[in-house]
Amino acid sequence: GYRKYRASRFEEYALYQEYQRFLPDSQVITFTDLDGKLRAIKPDVTLSIAKTAQPAAGECKRFYYNEEVCRPSRESHTFQTIHQMGLESMGAVDADEQAAVVRLALQSLAALDVPTVLEVSHMGYLTGLLDALSVPAEARARLLDFLRAKNAHELRTAALDAGLDDTAAAALTGLLDLHGPLGATLTKARAACLCDAQRNALEELQVLQNALGEDGRGTQLDLSMADEMEYYNGLVFTGYVAGIPRAVLKGGRYDYLMQRFTPGANAIGFAMYLDELERLAAPLPPVQQQGGEKTWLNIALPKGRLGDKAYKLLAGAGYSATEDYNDTRKLVVENPDACVRYF
């Protein structure tokens, strides 16, 4: 079973300074405590658990938590408190343990009693491709930014600028097409493999699918997922809820971090973002509350960053479009359910 982990609100800043690359953001709130030590308001729970878990060889320790962390907000550019509930499995993590954690993630989403979807991926497929194409280390960060943004045109241009040929650039942009139902996308991805690292990643995903069985029905595979590559090294997964524009669940394997504290140990876990889930109880946008004939809200967005910022604010209020207006050549994008249209 899982044992509850109770974290202190503060940690010595040295912990976050040493493991900064594993944090979602390098900015933390620090203060000098009464004993003269520099401390920080906790920006992460997993680091604290990994530091203290210390599983013995062959042992698997399991924890769950319900905690608050403090992180910078990209929208408000201020620090905000984030309420998380999650679990961690540390030590001897095998395929069965990995499948058990993913099954718990699926069950957590199902308990919300609203339409949800879990997307999975594997960092080994992406890093294997980058290595197989001999992508220069200094070019990878820029390429990954365009991959995260699902921007095929800029990704191809950046690949060519990095010295890759047309075939290699096409292999990178082809990642954006490897998205869909888990089984069908696995078959499609096998045909695109260039190295053993990619094949091994797909085999691990196949084992996961087999282990989940009917519990995994509806699971999606997105091999272009490139978030937090410094943190995750194998399986990654993200949960979404209808009506909420951002992910409500994130998790995956973080063996490299775990091995910094306990050599030879592996780890997997996930967190649910309870603040995001509060949107489910929020009032619907006015256009969704109206009965009878639909009334559309037409919005003309300004160009550039101001338009991007305006769209993010509106999407956060429940007025997102079914297509990202930045990723399409269409002059008009809309969301019929929310009765909103962007020009």
Segments (PLM) and residue ranges:
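Short secondary-structure junctions
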Residues: 3-7, 218-219, 316-324
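Short internal beta-strands
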Residues: 117-121, 300
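Acidic, His- and aromatic-enriched active-site or binding-groove loops in soluble protein domains
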Residues: 26-34, 135-159, 164, 241
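Short, conserved phosphate-binding/catalytic loop or strand-edge motifs used
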Residues: 81-85, 121-128
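Polyanion/phosphate-binding surface patch
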Residues: 10-39
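N-terminal hydrophobic or amphipathic helices and topogenic motifs
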Residues: 291-343
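Short acidic-glycine loop/turn motifs at beta-strand connectors
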Residues: 32-35, 92, 241-244, 335-336
